[in-house]
């Protein structure tokens, strides 16, 4: 695959919270970046179109360890949400794929699905690791689907090309 965009290295952190956190930690310790720019897929929960590039404003974690901490917070670190930008887009990070035909979700999980604009698996752990190491973090998501996983791979190539153009324009002023 592609190794860089305009000399900026590209790293894959994997799918899911655990892989993302582990691999991001290893990358930070080895590369020592000042800024991490995340690009990944997300599911649409509200009004966004497939292929759209979205800058994440706030990211929330799906963890439920009550009574030790409130919903969305990990005990001992008390970081329940991470503000990334003023975009106003709320992202819910969860390893649980949302299926609107299920009825057995926890009440707080459903509240977050209703409150947030998009859902992903990796944004919160990546933001958390960067925050812990005092490294700047921006996250851009492309809307991969509206529940149709059969089109994900086809949409991935389009999403990456859209992100590449957005990245070059945003960070280098070129396209």
Place the predicted regions along the sequence by residue:
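Glycine-rich phosphate- or other oxyanion-binding loops that anchor nucleotides, phosphorylated ligands
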Residues: 2-175
């Amino acid at each position: 695959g592609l190794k860089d965009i305009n000399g900026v290295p590209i790293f894959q952190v994997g799918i899911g919270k655990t892989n993302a956190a582990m691999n991001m930690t290893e990358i930070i310790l080895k590369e020592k970046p000042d800024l991490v720019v995340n690009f990944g897929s997300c599911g649409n929960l509200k009004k966004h179109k497939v292929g759209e590039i979205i800058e994440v404003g706030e990211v929330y974690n799906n963890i439920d360890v009550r009574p030790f901490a409130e919903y969305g917070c990990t005990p001992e670190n008390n970081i329940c949400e991470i503000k990334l930008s003023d975009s106003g887009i709320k992202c819910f990070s969860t390893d649980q794929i949302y299926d609107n035909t299920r009825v057995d979700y926890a009440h707080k999980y459903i509240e977050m699905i209703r409150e947030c604009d998009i859902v992903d698996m990796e944004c919160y752990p990546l933001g958390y690791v960067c925050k812990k190491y005092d490294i700047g973090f921006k996250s851009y998501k492309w809307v991969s689907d509206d529940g149709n996983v059969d089109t994900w791979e086809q949409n991935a190539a389009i999403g990456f090309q859209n992100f590449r153009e957005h990245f070059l324009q945003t960070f280098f002023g070129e396209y």
